[in-house]
Amino acid sequence: MTTNRIPVAADHGFAPRRVALTIGALAGAVLIAYANTWSVPFLFDDIVTIVDNPTIRSARPWSSVLSPAAHTGVGGRPIAHLSLVCNYAIGGEAVAGYHGVNLALHLLSGLALFGLVRRTLLRPALAPGLGSHAGAIATAVAALWLLHPVQTQSVTYLSQRTEILMALFYLCTLYCFARGAEPPGRPGWLAASVLSCFAGMASKEVMVTAPVMVLLYDWVFVAGSVRSAWQARWRYYPIARS
C-alpha cells in the first residue's frame, strides 16, 4: 500500500480559515446544547470525589496528588485527580467551574476526532472516493460525537471527569499516530501519541486498549498488514504498550 501523503488542499479547499470556522461552530453547538447544565449540582459519586475529598484541596505534598487514595474515587488515576486539584485551586467548590472544564475537555475530544477522521479520509486508500468530502464528513462525525445524548452523563456528571479525560487521550493517541505515520515519518508525533497513551492510562484503566486500536488503525489505513506495521514502527509499539 502506498503511503504518500495527500495534501489538505485535496479537500476542496478546506483551508485553515474554514477549519477555524468549523471549530467555532462545533464549540457554539456544544455551548448551546449544554447551556442549562452549568448549575447541575454535585451528585452521587461527586460527593466522595469532590465535595468530601480533602486530597483535592492542596497540591502538596506532590506525591499525594500523583498517588490519590482509593477511597477518593480517583485512586490510580492521577491525571484525573490533578485536574480536580487544579479545579479546586481556581474556583473551590463552585460547581460551574467543574462543568466548564468538563465541557472544554469534551469539546477537545470532538476536535481530536474531527482531525483524526479528516486525515484518515485523506489517506491514499480513501482519498479518491472520499477525500473531496473529508472536511464535511469529519465535521458531521465530530458533531455527532459532541451532541449525542449518550454523552450527557459523562459531561454533566462531574465525577465522570475520568471518562472524558480517557476519551480525549484515546483520540489524541490515534490522531498523533496518524500524523506520525505520514511519510517521511514524524517521530515527534509518534512520541506525542505515546505520551497521550500514558496520560490516558493515568486517567482511566480502559485506556489499556489504545495500543491495540492503534495497531488496527496502522494495519487497516497505513501499513496494510500487521507485519508491515510492526516492521515500520517496531520501536513505537512496545513503548506504547508499556
Residue ranges and their predicted role:
Residues 1-242:
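Polytopic membrane enzymes that build or remodel cell-surface glycoconjugates and lipids
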